[in-house]
């Protein structure tokens, strides 16, 4: 009835913090935030990399955070931080200083007409955390990295990302590596089998 009449799917999850979709999806967001800083990339640059090019929604990562609400995201992160003290990736479960600063100013994302992104007239601007100010957004992707992402064979695509010295490629490899590793380690704690994980992130976060 849920599937045929409501058009919804059922995800069987174990009783753990954030269940399946949020546990994996929010971890992926945190991995993106961590490696954004590690590789010195811009938020708009990262959204260009983590959207449709890798089978995720156009809103990608930071724009998705704005849509969800930065205060809501911070609450979910705080839940992970306080309830999962033994998680091997616990160091990732923290709200960056720039995120806390936006929340303190009441810049919560789309619902307050400004957060990580902000529209000024006809111009979309994005936060530069180093300067604490917004600048015009530009999702510029290196042509070589874009070429790697067009490779149809996943093995060849991941191998090329791992081998590339370009920061954008190294960033994508690091995020993919961490997310897959996290799923492999935590699967037994959050779901009965791997088949329950894939629909959870497809339906919950729009991943393909």
Locate the predicted segments by residue.
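N-terminal glycine-rich phosphate-binding loop for ADP-containing cofactors
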Residues: 1-208
């Amino acid at each position: 009835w849920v599937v045929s009449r409501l058009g919804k799917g059922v995800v069987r999850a174990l009783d753990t913090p954030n269940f399946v979709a949020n546990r994996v999806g929010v971890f992926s967001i945190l991995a993106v935030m961590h490696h954004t800083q590690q590789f010195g990339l811009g938020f708009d640059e990262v959204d260009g990399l983590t959207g449709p090019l890798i089978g995720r929604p156009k809103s990608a990562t930071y724009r998705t955070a704005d849509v969800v609400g930065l205060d809501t995201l911070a609450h979910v992160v705080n839940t992970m931080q306080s309830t999962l003290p033994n998680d091997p990736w616990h160091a990732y479960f923290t709200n960056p200083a720039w995120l806390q600063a936006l929340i303190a100013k009441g810049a919560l994302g789309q619902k307050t007409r400004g957060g990580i992104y902000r529209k000024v007239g006809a111009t979309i601007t994005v936060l530069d955390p180093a300067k604490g100010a917004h600048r015009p957004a530009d999702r510029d992707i290196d042509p070589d990295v874009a070429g790697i992402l067009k490779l149809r064979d996943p093995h060849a695509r991941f191998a090329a990302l791992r081998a590339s010295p370009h920061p954008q490629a190294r960033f994508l490899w690091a995020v993919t590596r961490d997310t897959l590793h996290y799923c492999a380690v935590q699967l037994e704690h959050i779901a009965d089998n791997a088949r329950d994980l894939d629909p959870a992130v497809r339906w919950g976060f729009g991943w393909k």
